[in-house]
Structures are given as C-alpha cells and as structure tokens.
From Swiss-Prot:
This reaction introduces a second double bond into the aromatic ring system. The keyword Flavoprotein applies. One of its GO terms (biological process) is aromatic amino acid family biosynthetic process. Pfam families: Chorismate_synt. It comes from the Bacteria. NADP(+) binds at R48, R54. It comes from Shigella flexneri serotype 5b (strain 8401). Gene3D superfamilies: Chorismate synthase AroC. Keywords: Amino-acid biosynthesis, Aromatic amino acid biosynthesis, FAD, Flavoprotein, FMN, Lyase, NADP. PROSITE patterns: CHORISMATE_SYNTHASE_1, CHORISMATE_SYNTHASE_2, CHORISMATE_SYNTHASE_3. Reduced FMN (FMNH(2)). This is Chorismate synthase. Belongs to the chorismate synthase family.
Length: 361
C-alpha cells in the first residue's frame, strides 16, 4: 500500500491498523540537538486519545508513546525517530458479525475493490486510530517550530451541526470537552450530543486551525504551494470532506475590492487569503478550516449489501464518536505543523542566504 508518507525533508511515515498489535511511525528530517522526551509528545496524544469524555468513543487506549530511535541522552541525533503506540483495548469480536457486510459510508467496499480483501476489525488501516501517530509526529514539529521560530499552532471547533461557534476565547478551548472557543455555546453542544447519543445518530463538524508567527516566504510555486500542501494534509484526515484556506468559499460572494488584502506602511489591512499569496506565506496568520462528515458508525438502521451482493439491513455496533470533529482538533494542528515544518526546512535549504529590504510585520 502506497501513500503512507507525507513530506519531503520532514517526512512522516505511519504504519499499523486499528486492531493490530501496535501503531507506529518513522519521522525523518528532524534536526539534531533538539531536546525531546516522550512527555513532549504525550500532551497532544492525551488530547486526541479516546475514552476521555462521555462525548467520544469509549474505547480506552492509554496511547502511551515510546521513542525507539533517533534520541540519545534526551536530544535528537538527526537520524530517523521511531515511535510506537501499543493497542490495548481492541474488541475485535464487535466486528465479527459484519466481516462479510460493507458498512455504508465507510471504506469497506472501496478497500475490498482495491485490494481484494480487507481487515474488517474496526476498519483496519482506514480507521482514525492511525491518526495517533500523526499527532505524535506533529508534536515534534510543533516543539521545533515553537522553540526555534516562535510559531504557535492552535485549533478549535468552529461549528457542530447547525451550531456555529465564534472564536471568543482561545484559553477556553482546553477547558471543555468540545475544544469550543465560544462560552455561549457549550450548553447547546452538550444538549446536541446528549440527543445524538439517545438517538444513536451522529453529526458533522467544522474545525479551524491557526498558525501564528509563520515567517514570510514559505511555500513553493505551482504544485507545492503552501496552501495546496495544507489542503492535502488536512484532506488526508479521516472524515474530512472539505478544506478552506482563509475565507474559502465565502470569497465567491465578494468583489475584488472587498477581497484583496490591502497593504499600508502599517501592514496588511485584512487577511481574507489566510496568510498565503501565490502559494507562499505572507507573514500573517495562516488560517485553515476543514469540514468533517458525520460518522457512518451509528445504530440507526441503514441499507447495504454483503460481499455476495445480497441486500441487508445494517446497524453498527461497537464504540464510536457521535461527532468525530471533536477529537480532530489536535489532528488538524499536527498536520498543519508537519506541513509548516517541511516547508521551513525546504526554505532554509534553498534560500537561507536570501535577504530583502522590504517591510515585514
């Protein structure tokens, strides 16, 4: 199976399945001499891991990461960093009844069409369980970007179902189970989630991720535009069906005189473009949004077929998230960090000696 690696200079390759023995990844391109411990990675893993609230799947995985290589006496050596997380709470028996049935809205049908077989236990490689390793690798990138360049990456939920959320207080995001920045909407989210659990249904969500302190000049022309790579990275997250950079699809209703980010001697006067022009960072905040579909793993009966072509009624059993957007916040942060880390290393490799006299803000 190809497609397990992202990045050029900062490269992350993941492996493992939902109900396998373990998940792992290899991180290449980490500069030497960076202080790094397992505790540095664990914080974001704890934010993503299942079973931490009544609003997410009750699969209880400690997600304790192990650093297998690439770190000596507490600092990175410049060689490949191997990371491993053991799976400890698999319940494969929950899936034995559906081994011949294609769950609607899942990758069961497409995986079998592609490979001629599939690991039906929790979705195998297509499970969002894989994203634990992205978060671990992303934590390395976030640490480097923060300590060496002052770049801060943070994400939050900005919509659940038909409930829009305003970014009113970033400090609130880590104080509630929804990663919600809007204190006026937390009760409404709680009510919605309770109703969904009672109905056995699910709901979609929108997640916003913001990078501050990104220098101007990151990104490549044409095919490796910074916004293209960010969109690629975010679209690779399970259940993501749409990505916007800056104002995204809202620009359709704007005129050029409204949408252009005008510049004065004091800097940019707006940020409709999300901090990227011509595929290259402008030095403004980089802002991206992603839309996540409602999970198809619900107890509401639905129609599908089995591998013999027979129509059957499907009710998904097991432990699942009523809204996958909640735990997607640290995953989105990780993927943005991985892309920025890669482009920063590429910029340093090619254009380290470039100096300009034009203003920076």
């Amino acid at each position: 199976m190809a497609g397990n690696t992202i990045g050029q200079l900062f490269r992350v390759t993941t492996f493992g399945e939902s109900h396998g023995l373990a998940l792992g990844c290899i991180v290449d391109g980490v500069p030497p001499g960076i202080p790094l411990t397992e505790a540095d990675l664990q914080h974001d893993l704890d934010r993503r891991r299942p079973g931490t609230s009544r609003y997410t799947t009750q699969r209880r995985e400690p997600d304790q990461v192990k650093i297998l290589s690439g770190v000596f006496e507490g600092v990175t050596t410049g060689t490949s960093i191997g990371l491993l997380i053991e799976n400890t709470d698999q319940r494969s028996q929950d899936y034995s009844a559906i081994k011949d049935v294609f769950r609607p809205g899942h990758a069961d049908y497409t995986y079998e069409q592609k490979y001629g077989l599939r690991d039906y236990r929790g979705g195998g490689r297509s499970s969002a369980r894989e994203t634990a390793m992205r978060v671990a690798a992303g934590a390395i990138a976030k640490k480097y970007l923060s300590e060496k360049f002052g770049i801060e990456i943070r994400g939050c939920l900005t919509q659940m179902g038909d409930i829009p959320l305003e970014i009113k207080d970033w400090s609130l995001v880590e104080q509630n189970p929804f990663f919600c920045p809007d204190p006026d909407k937390i009760d409404a989210l709680d009510e919605l989630m309770r109703a969904l659990k009672k109905e056995g249904d699910s709901i979609g969500a929108k997640v916003t991720v913001v990078a501050s302190g990104v220098p101007a000049g990151l990104g490549e022309p044409v095919f490796d535009r910074l916004d293209a790579d960010i969109a690629h990275a975010l679209m690779s997250i399970n259940a993501v069906k749409g990505v916007e950079i800056g104002d995204g699809f809202d620009v359709v209703a704007l005129r050029g005189s409204q949408n252009r980010d005008e510049i004065t001697k004091d800097g940019f006067q707006s940020n409709h473009a999300g901090g990227i022009f011509g595929g290259i960072s402008s030095g403004q905040q980089i802002i991206a949004h992603m839309a996540l579909k409602p999970t198809s793993s619900i107890t509401v009966p639905g129609r599908t077929i089995n591998r013999f072509g027979e129509e059957v009624e499907m009710i998904t059993k097991g432990r699942h998230d009523p809204c996958v957007g909640i735990r997607a916040v640290p995953i989105a942060e990780a993927m943005l960090a991985i892309v920025l880390m890669d482009h920063l290393l590429r910029q340093r490799a090619q254009n380290a000696d470039v100096k300009t006299d034009i203003p920076r803000w």
